Design a protein with these regions (language model features):
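Active-site-adjacent structural elements in enzyme catalytic cores
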Residues: 1-171
Length: 171
């Protein structure tokens, strides 16, 4: 099971949670946040939350739901779980979430059916942190609501090639 993402209400909170916010991550946040993009970056050394086996990273997203944003402005960042069990489709309504998760969840917030019904796109942007000559492309860890084509409009060649379009090694 993947570590839970951390929901935030502002890019300023992102800066407090991660070691560095590369320029391209700023551009992604400006275009796709609030929204269905989860970005994995190296966590601040001072981040002591037990988020599971993260290998020193944190997955961060700014939700598009106004109630969630208001809550986050009051509470600060929150580590959250998806409204589904690993391998199961995402719940679109609070009833579906309750049927799937039951009493394992203490509080359900109901803002009506999810408009997208799609999971967030998760990208690994850890390769953008550090010296420029050591940078690696951004990897898509999970395809979701934001397509690779949309990501490419911001990242260009900094987005990894899709698996089926990568050049084949010469025999």
């Amino acid at each position: 099971q993947a570590p839970p993402p951390v929901l935030i209400a502002s890019v300023n909170t992102l800066r407090a949670l991660v070691q560095e916010v590369p320029e391209m991550v700023e551009a992604l946040a400006e275009k796709f946040w609030p929204g269905a993009l989860t970005i994995v970056l190296p966590a601040q050394q001072s981040l002591v939350w037990d988020l599971g086996e993260t290998h020193g990273t944190v997955a961060v997203r700014m939700p598009a739901n106004r109630y969630a944003l208001e809550l986050l402005q009051e509470t600060g960042p929150l580590a959250v779980s998806s409204a589904n069990l690993t391998g199961q489709p995402a719940a679109v309504t609070v009833e579906q979430a309750h049927d799937m998760l039951g009493e394992r969840v203490a509080v359900y917030l109901d803002d009506g059916p999810s408009v997208m019904g799609l999971a967030s796109t998760i990208i690994d942007a850890t390769g953008l942190v550090g010296p420029e000559d050591e940078r690696r492309p951004v990897r898509v860890l999970r395809d979701g609501a934001i397509s690779r084509a949309e990501l490419r409009t911001v990242l260009g060649d900094l987005l990894e090639r899709e698996p089926d379009t990568a050049p084949k090694p010469a025999p």
